[in-house]
């Protein structure tokens, strides 16, 4: 019985671990979450320069705010550091750090709808006019 409980805990922990995507793995995941094909190279570039395709990535900014996950979503405006979902995306920041990118994708699309790619410095500084090749994906 004790072995069964330990096995169940291991399975639960593995299911919520972070993930680092390959470039094509990221493309497939973004397609699965309904990202527009005509913007795909922009999204891939953004994610590569913001988080290196790592869902567990965090970054503390000079102003004390923190960015979370694949899309480096900021806690000042978009996600709540507390135990309850909140802010503009109505999501907990910790939910943006798992291998299930559903909530992160939904929030990133909301940010894009409001600010386009200009909301992300990784895109502004690295992706304008220089997008990755995803033709083999």
UniProtKB/Swiss-Prot annotation:
InterPro entries: Glyco_hydro_22, Glyco_hydro_22_CS, Glyco_hydro_22_lys, Lysozyme-like_dom_sf. One of its GO terms (biological process) is killing of cells of another organism. Residues 19-137 form the C-type lysozyme domain. The lineage of its organism: Eukaryota, Metazoa, Ecdysozoa, Arthropoda, Hexapoda. It comes from Bombyx mori (Silk moth). Induction: By bacterial infection. PROSITE patterns: GLYCOSYL_HYDROL_F22_1, GLYCOSYL_HYDROL_F22_2. Disulfide bonds join 24-137, 45-127, 79-93, 89-107. Its EC number is 3.2.1.17. This is Lysozyme. Residues 1-18 form the signal peptide. Lysozymes have primarily a bacteriolytic function; those in tissues and body fluids are associated with the monocyte-macrophage system and enhance the activity of immunoagents. Active against E.coli and M.luteus. It catalyses: Hydrolysis of (1->4)-beta-linkages between N-acetylmuramic acid and N-acetyl-D-glucosamine residues in a peptidoglycan and between N-acetyl-D-glucosamine residues in chitodextrins. Keywords: Antibiotic, Antimicrobial, Bacteriolytic enzyme, Disulfide bond, Glycosidase, Hydrolase, Signal. One of its GO terms (molecular function) is lysozyme activity. The active site is at 50, 67. It comes from the Eukaryota.
């Amino acid at each position: 019985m004790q072995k069964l409980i330990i096995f169940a805990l291991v399975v639960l922990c593995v299911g919520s671990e972070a993930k680092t995507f390959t470039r094509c793995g990221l493309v497939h995941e973004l397609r699965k979450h309904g990202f527009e094909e005509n913007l795909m190279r922009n999204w891939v570039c953004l994610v590569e320069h913001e988080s290196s395709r790592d869902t567990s990535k965090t970054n503390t900014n000079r102003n004390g705010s923190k960015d979370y996950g694949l899309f480096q979503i900021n806690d000042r405006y978009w996600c709540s550091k507390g135990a309850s979902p909140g802010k503009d995306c109505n999501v907990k920041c910790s939910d943006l750090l798992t291998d299930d990118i559903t909530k992160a994708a939904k929030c990133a699309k909301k940010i894009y709808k409001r600010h386009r790619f200009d909301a992300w410095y990784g895109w502004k500084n690295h992706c304008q006019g220089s997008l990755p090749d995803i033709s083999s994906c």
